[in-house]
Amino acid sequence: MRDALASEVEATGDLARVTVGSITDRAGLTRRTFYSHYHDIADLVSQTEDDVLRDLRGLVADVASVRLEDLYETIDELEPCPGSVELLEYFKANGHVLTALLGQGGDPAFVEKIKVMVHEVVAGRALDGIDARALGAFFDYYLTFAISAEVGVLLRWLAGGMREGVDVMARIMTLLMFVRPGDLYDNTMDFNIPAYGLAVMQRLINTEEDSDDE
């Protein structure tokens, strides 16, 4: 029924226009069969998304568990981040349903659910070994930026019909994590990110202290 749901979203261009009747007709099933599994269309969508989120949580955790030292080594060897191929293979295998739900006619809230899940999985691992002075707003915005960027790349890949192979896309996403301003224009901006970030955080702390004194 999930493939039928995806096909109906594609056919109508809008999840809100999908009906139980259209899904059962496309799937060659009876309404009784549908209602023996789901309460309504919203329940079908919810269960589908919950299953995807559960599957993705484990795959994202595998990627997040990679140590920076190991990641640097794989990049030197022009290999993708460990775990990224498996993650993309999941998207490829479930591309029909994921493209429908994450596309323009799908469920806008689903993208945010994925971002929240990734944040939950990655945040704890990202804190390991971090300079305590970088915690707070700077770290939160950095994580939000990184997650939104990676999820955005995945959505672009889906929307483009996943033309690039999994191995190629895994390497692209790995490299994108380390692209600096100017890298693509032979004019790399090589500046001290930790020092800059800590200076920004110190300004924030000073501003908050000044506000408390007023």
Label the predicted regions.
Residues 3-6, 10, 24, 37, ...:
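Localized chelating/binding microdomains
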Residues 105-131, 137-152, 182:
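Amphipathic alpha-helical packing segments from all-alpha helical-bundle domains
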Residues 60-96:
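Hydrophobic alpha-helical connector segments
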Residues 3-7, 26, 43-66, 82, ...:
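Alpha-helical structural segments
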Residues 11-43:
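Helix-turn-helix
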Residues 17-18, 99-101, 166:
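Short, hydrophobic secondary-structure boundary micro-motifs
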